[in-house]
């Protein structure tokens, strides 16, 4: 497969939570650090970088400031260094319960404290020097085995997860990381959890919880017995092996999970590449040849469609659409026009893609009618995590409303309904819009919401009122935005 941004390893960003459940924060004023924040936002986000030398020391860089954490000999800490010096070198010492201890490499003292009383002067580790790692990236991704160069996916027939996919195609390749009790669970697309013996279980039991470790920018998952997940045997079954130290077999990359979609034309048949290079609406079944990976260009907001056969849709002579391009170009870009529950696609020749009488697609129309409208269905988010500008969407304690500014997230279930989606929460209740634009999550009857894919990795959600869902100043989810922009766009 060509690169073209299809396989992008996620830069691991995280927060560090102390023993009093407060996040390590880098302040712009005076470049001071504290542990006062109750949730994970921009100021609480950090990146681990390897030290330029050959040792085991690491650097902690604030994503917010772009500066490095440092500890002086007298224990004073700051986040002021634009270039990493000797005082910026730390050793990460993972503890049996999964938490980290940070020790200054040049001075040998431990970093910790509470509120604005942080220092790196402790000679022994107490609870104040223990830090929990909380990933700051969107938790839905693909998992790539570093040693086998194969993607992890659910194998329903064998009832296991295996690292044997040469590409992350279809819903089975989606994994959701669930953060609970200072550890992480791996949740499959059918909402089961991976246990360390390779079994899939419905509850996040202790043997299905893992400690995250970082090594050279890669991830390792350590189980409660101190062993690491790895692909095992010819099938690459994912389970805890015998190793108590992470080697290449135990390392994984997290990759961005782009939306994969199917399109249905006016003849009620699926758009497909099953019968060759022509893109045609001529299939009754929804399989790999009918599934397309959709990417949106951040600058132009136009999209590309990549097929399972290894080619992008591209405009050819006489307006034809073939799935043969190996590189992104102007001819592979399509402008999306959202028309209620349907979408129209405009090609680089300025004409709309339509379905011809023989089912083939061609960009030959000047206007949009039924033959130019398609139903677009997202297939690789049966479970959904939403993040806005202020945080994740999560149920509001003691209420039927939804918060939009949380550092923890709820996992919602999606079902498709003729160009729209129904969203179901943790207790089985459906989302619906109430009075004055409020969005509630305890409905007995489902309301249809339209998803509009507006930017790379972000969508807008339109309620039946025609208004878009946004994160309000109160921190509650509301359906009162007029335009799909800003706080009305959601990372998914």
Curated annotation (Swiss-Prot):
Record gene name: FSCN2
Assigned protein family: Belongs to the fascin family.
Protein name: Fascin-2
Gene3D superfamilies xrefs: 2.80.10.50
Keyword Cytoplasm: yes
An example Gene Ontology CC term for this record: cytoplasm
Predominant cellular place of this UniProt entry's protein: cytoplasm
InterPro entries the record matches: Actin-crosslinking (IPR008999), Fascin (IPR010431), Fascin-like_dom (IPR022768), Fascin_metazoans (IPR024703)
Domain of life according to the entry: Eukaryota
Gene Ontology MF, one: actin filament binding
Tissue specificity annotation: Localized specifically in the outer and inner segments of the photoreceptor cells in the retina.
PANTHER family: FASCIN, FASCIN-2
Keyword terms, alphabetized: Actin-binding, Cell projection, Cytoplasm, Cytoskeleton, Retinitis pigmentosa
One BP annotation, GO: cell migration
């Amino acid at each position: 497969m060509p690169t073209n941004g299809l396989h992008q390893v996620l830069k691991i960003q995280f927060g560090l939570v102390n023993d009093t459940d407060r996040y390590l924060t880098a302040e712009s004023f005076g470049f001071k650090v504290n542990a006062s924040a109750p949730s994970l936002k921009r100021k609480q986000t950090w990146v681990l970088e390897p030290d330029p030398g050959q040792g085991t020391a690491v650097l902690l860089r604030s994503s917010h400031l772009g500066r490095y954490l440092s500890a002086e000999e007298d224990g004073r800490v700051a986040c002021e260094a634009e270039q990493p010096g000797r005082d910026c070198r730390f050793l990460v010492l993972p503890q049996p319960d999964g938490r980290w201890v940070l020790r200054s490499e040049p001075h040998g003292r431990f970093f910790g404290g509470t509120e604005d009383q942080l220092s790196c002067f402790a000679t022994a580790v107490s609870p104040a020097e223990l830090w929990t790692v909380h990933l700051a990236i969107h938790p839905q991704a693909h998992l790539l085995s570093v040693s086998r160069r194969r993607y992890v996916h659910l194998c329903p027939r064998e009832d296991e997860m295996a690292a044997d996919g040469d590409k992350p195609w279809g819903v089975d390749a989606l994994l959701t990381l669930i953060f609970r009790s200072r550890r992480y669970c791996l949740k499959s697309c059918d909402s089961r959890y991976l246990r360390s013996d390779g079994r899939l279980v419905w509850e996040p039991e202790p043997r299905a919880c893992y400690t995250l470790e970082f090594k050279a920018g890669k991830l390792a998952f350590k189980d409660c017995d101190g062993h690491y997940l790895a692909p095992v045997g010819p099938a690459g079954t994912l389970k805890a092996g015998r190793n108590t130290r992470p080697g290449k077999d135990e390392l994984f990359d997290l990759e961005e999970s782009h939306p994969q979609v199917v399109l249905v034309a006016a003849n009620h048949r699926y758009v497909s590449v099953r019968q060759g290079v022509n893109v045609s609406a001529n299939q009754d079944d929804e399989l790999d040849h009918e599934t397309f990976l959709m990417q949106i260009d951040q600058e132009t907001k136009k999209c590309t469609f990549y097929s399972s056969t290894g080619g992008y849709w591209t405009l050819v002579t006489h307006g034809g659409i073939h799935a043969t391009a190996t590189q992104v170009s102007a001819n592979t870009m399509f402008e999306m026009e959202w028309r209620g529950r349907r979408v129209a696609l405009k090609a680089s020749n300025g004409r709309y893609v339509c379905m011809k009488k023989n089912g083939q697609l061609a960009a030959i129309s000047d206007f949009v009618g039924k033959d130019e409208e398609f139903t677009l269905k997202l297939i690789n988010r049966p479970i959904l995590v939403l993040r806005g500008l202020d945080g994740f969407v999560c149920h509001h304690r003691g209420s039927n409303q939804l918060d939009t500014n949380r550092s923890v997230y709820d996992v919602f279930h999606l079902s498709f309904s003729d160009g729209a989606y129904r969203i179901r929460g943790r207790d089985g209740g459906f989302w619906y819009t109430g009075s004055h634009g409020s969005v509630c999550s305890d409905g007995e009857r489902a309301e249809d919401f339209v998803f509009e894919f507006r930017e790379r990795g972000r969508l807008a959600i339109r309620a039946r009122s025609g208004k878009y869902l946004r994160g309000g100043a109160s921190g509650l989810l509301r359906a009162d935005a007029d335009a799909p922009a800003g706080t009305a766009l959601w990372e998914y």
